[in-house]
Design a protein with these regions (language model features):
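Residue-level signature of catalytic and energy-coupling elements of molecular machines
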Residues: 2, 17, 84, 108, ...
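Catalytic donor-sugar/metal-binding loop of nucleotide-sugar-dependent glycosyltransferases
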Residues: 95-96, 105-123
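Acceptor/aglycone-binding surface of glycosyltransferases and processive sugar-polymer synthases
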Residues: 1-5, 10, 23-98, 125-135, ...
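C-terminal, non-catalytic tails of nucleotide-sugar-dependent glycosyltransferases
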Residues: 143-156
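Short acidic donor-binding/metal-coordinating loop in glycosyltransferase active sites
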Residues: 8, 16-19
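DNA-recognition element of transcription regulators
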Residues: 102
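Active-site loop/turn elements of alpha/beta-hydrolase fold enzymes
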Residues: 18, 44, 120
Length: 156
C-alpha cells in the first residue's frame, strides 16, 4: 500500500527527515504541471551532509550511469520526485525499500520518460547520523546487478 493507491493526476514523495526542502514539493509540482514531462525531481547541487556520504552518493550515481547509460538525470536518489499518474501506471515497480528511487529512474530510462530536474540544497541532518553505512555499498551493487540482468532479459 502506498503509491498504488494514489489516484490524483500527479504522485509525489519526499523523505521526512528534514534534509530535503519541503518547498521543493511546490517547485517540482509547478514544473511538471506547466510542462510536458513525465517525471520531475530535484538534483542536490549543494550538500551539507558528511564527506563520506557525499562520496558514497557520487560513486552510486557514477555506477548508475555506467550500468544504465543514457538517462537524463544527475542525482538518482534526490527528492522530492513527482510523476504523472499515467507514467506511474506504466512503470513496473517492485521495490518497497530505499532502492525505490533507483528503480523509478531505471523504469524512467526503460520507458524513455521525459525528465526534468530542479536544483536544490540538501541539509545536514542535525538529529541523527546517516542510515547509509559503508556496507550499504555492497547492497547497492547487488541491486544494480539484479536490475541490470533483469533489463538484459527483458530486452531479449
Amino acid at each position: 500500500i502506498g503509491l498504488e493507491v494514489a489516484d490524483g493526476k500527479y504522485i509525489s514523495f519526499i523523505d521526512g527527515d528534514g534534509q530535503m526542502l519541503a518547498e521543493d514539493v511546490v517547485i517540482v509540482y509547478q514544473k511538471i504541471k506547466n510542462s510536458d514531462l513525465d517525471l520531475v525531481k530535484t538534483c542536490r547541487y549543494i550538500r551539507y551532509d558528511e564527506k563520506w556520504r557525499k562520496a558514497i552518493s557520487f560513486f552510486y550515481n557514477l555506477l548508475f550511469k555506467v550500468l544504465f547509460p543514457g538517462l537524463n538525470a544527475k542525482d538518482i536518489n534526490s527528492k522530492p520526485k513527482i510523476f504523472t499518474k499515467k507514467f506511474y501506471d506504466k512503470m513496473e515497480l517492485k521495490s518497497d525499500d530505499w532502492f525505490a528511487d533507483a528503480e523509478i529512474m531505471i523504469e524512467a530510462r526503460r520507458l524513455k520518460a521525459k525528465i526534468g530536474e530542479v536544483p536544490t540544497i540538501f541539509k545536514k541532518n542535525e538529529h541523527r547520523p546517516s542510515f547509509v553505512k559503508f556496507s550499504a555499498i555492497f547492497e547497492f551493487i547487488k541491486n544494480f546487478i539484479i536490475y541490470r540482468i533483469r533489463e538484459f532479459k527483458r530486452n531479449k
